[in-house]
Regions:
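Amphipathic alpha-helical segments used for helix-helix packing
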Residues: 101-121
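C-terminal peripheral helix-coil segments that are non-catalytic and often amphipathic
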Residues: 1-2, 98-99, 135-147, 162, ...
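Amphipathic alpha-helical packing segments from all-alpha helical-bundle domains
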Residues: 69-72, 76, 120-147, 157-161, ...
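Hydrophobic alpha-helical connector segments
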Residues: 62, 76-106, 156, 160-163
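Short, hydrophobic secondary-structure boundary micro-motifs
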Residues: 108-110, 122-123, 149, 153, ...
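Generic hydrophobic, amphipathic alpha-helix propensity
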Residues: 13-22, 38, 63-67, 71, ...
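Helix-turn-helix
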Residues: 16, 24-58, 62
Length: 202
């Protein structure tokens, strides 16, 4: 249990619930997380938890909304301070790496939702996140082509998919190794290879 006070304002209680779910997802299969486990982690009864979230699906919606809002806000801030499209791509990459390193339950939650056969609202939120994230990447990749940083014949969609795919690969490698810190160690080298692959060689 986290030892949080039992009497929190509704917004703080919802935020604490999201935090508890993300923490639990780092320790176990997200699909196996029960409302009992969430309530126990927070030091609450199930009844108290359900006063804020009527269903487990509502909890997952809140978690996915937080992931989307938090990740996109962070990458937007990172890109805004960059001096060029390629610098912005690198800033986004490292910010994303920092985010999943700090919250290892997040990629587990995302992978878990995308594997759901039903088109649930949490799954739709993940799909919207992937779409919005990809759109940001394609805009930067297009700007890089226009400014001559990137290859003129670069396939924007493929480059965006590969960008996300390398992060997913780093996450999978860290899960296999049981070593979250490995993501941060390997990321600079992986991005360097990616950057060389899309750069203008002229």
């Amino acid at each position: 249990m986290t030892g949080r006070p039992r009497h929190l304002p509704a917004d703080e209680r919802r935020a604490a619930t999201v935090e508890a779910v993300v923490a639990l997802a780092a320790e176990q299969n997200p699909n196996d997380i029960t409302t009992t486990a969430i309530a126990h982690r927070m030091g609450l009864t199930q009844g108290a938890l359900f006063r804020h979230f009527p269903t487990k699906d509502a909890i997952l919606q809140a978690v996915m909304s937080w992931i989307s809002e938090c990740l996109l806000a962070r990458v937007d801030r990172a890109a805004a301070t960059a001096t060029s499209p390629v610098a912005a791509l690198e800033a986004i990459y490292m910010t994303h790496i920092d985010f999943v390193s700090a919250h290892p339950g997040v990629p587990r939650m995302i992978f878990g939702e995308l594997q759901q056969p039903a088109q649930t609202l949490p799954k739709q939120l993940v799909q919207a996140l992937v779409h919005d994230y990809g759109a940001r990447l394609r805009r930067l990749l297009e700007a890089g082509k226009t400014q001559g940083e990137l290859a003129a014949d670069l396939d924007l969609d493929a480059a965006a998919v590969l960008f996300i795919g390398t992060i997913q690969g780093l996450v999978m490698q860290s899960l296999l190794a049981g070593d979250v810190a490995r993501i941060r160690r390997d990321a600079p080298g992986v991005f360097a290879i990616y950057r060389r692959g899309i750069a203008n060689s002229q």
